[in-house]
A protein has these predicted regions:
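Hydrophobic/aromatic-enriched cytosolic interaction surfaces used to assemble or bind macromolecules
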Residues: 1-293
């Protein structure tokens, strides 16, 4: 189960969410998805498919429900979007630029979730200063590893209050790199069977380097490219590969934001689609149909 600070997240196995659904719901025991979704719909009156937003350092990309082929529209920020879309529901994804993770997972002690979060928070404070004391945390675990992800740069409580003032309900908040990672696994079935592999999710200069062991996520590291270019990404991949992988370990790259990302023939990775463009490629568009889970 994933947990946010001291409250269990209402999410299915495999999700990584900084969830901000109604506070009293966070105290309930997790139920099977269909029953829980039905109860939520009846009790809270969900208002249909949610809008999807991706928040990055320059604003937000917004996808409206209904037209699956429409490109995302740019807005100055989440609050601006909320004021223009009163009375709606939204699922929010956040750029790797807004997430932090524990670099050395081996340093995490074998404690319970509360102890793990406490240890991780202190590690974030030691590295990033007192501001990290209030960052929302989400823990994840699977058969081979566990980890902690922090949300930095977005005040979720303030955002939720602003949404309430405009009748906007935030259904979920999660890292964009995790959404892209799941799409990479869907597109490259070999990732699920490789003993070791890597997925690099690119968002301009921000990138997430995800390590897999036995087909599941074992480590996440946030990277900052020297510049938003293929050559800079190649240097980062070579450095990460030298640190954590051999030449025979598969590497998959996907994303957007590289100025010359239309030509990736020089990249030492299997590239899904193109890596240029200001916004995520259409095939990576997040679903606006799924309910919070």
């Amino acid at each position: 189960m994933l947990l946010l600070n001291d409250a269990p997240l209402l999410s299915m196995a495999g999700d990584i969410r900084f969830d901000v659904v109604v506070a009293d719901a966070l105290k309930r025991r997790v139920k099977p998805f269909r029953g829980w979704s039905r109860e939520l719909s009846q009790g809270l009156g969900l208002r249909g498919p949610a809008h999807a937003l991706l928040a990055d350092a320059h604003g937000v990309w917004a996808w409206a429900p209904g037209d699956r082929y429409a490109a995302a529209k740019r807005h100055g920020g989440v609050r601006e979007w909320m004021r223009a879309h009163a009375g709606t529901d939204v699922r929010l994804w956040v750029s790797a630029a807004f997430t932090q993770s524990i670099e050395d997972l081996a340093s995490l002690p074998p404690r319970d979730d509360a102890g793990l979060r406490s240890h991780a928070r202190q590690a974030f404070v030691d590295r990033h200063g007192d501001e990290a004391a209030t960052w929302p945390l989400a823990t994840w675990q699977n058969d081979v590893a566990r980890g902690v992800v922090a949300l930095a740069g977005i005040d979720l409580d303030a955002l939720r209050r602003h949404g309430a003032q405009n009748g906007v309900r935030i259904r979920s908040v999660e890292p964009w790199w995790h959404h892209a990672f799941l799409e990479a696994k869907r597109c490259v079935p070999a990732l699920a069977h490789a003993a070791n592999a890597h997925v690099c999710v690119v968002e301009g200069r921000a990138a997430a380097w995800i390590t897999l062991a036995g087909g599941v996520m074992s480590h996440v590291r946030r990277c900052v490219l020297e510049e938003a270019s293929v050559s800079s990404l190649n240097e980062t991949i070579e450095r990460m590969r030298a640190d954590r992988a051999g030449d025979d370990v598969p590497i998959v790259a996907l994303g957007h934001g590289l100025g010359d990302g239309g030509d990736t023939t020089r990249l030492c990775a299997h590239v899904l689609g193109r890596l240029d463009g200001d916004q995520p490629p259409q095939w990576l568009r997040p679903s606006t149909q799924n309910e919070v889970h």
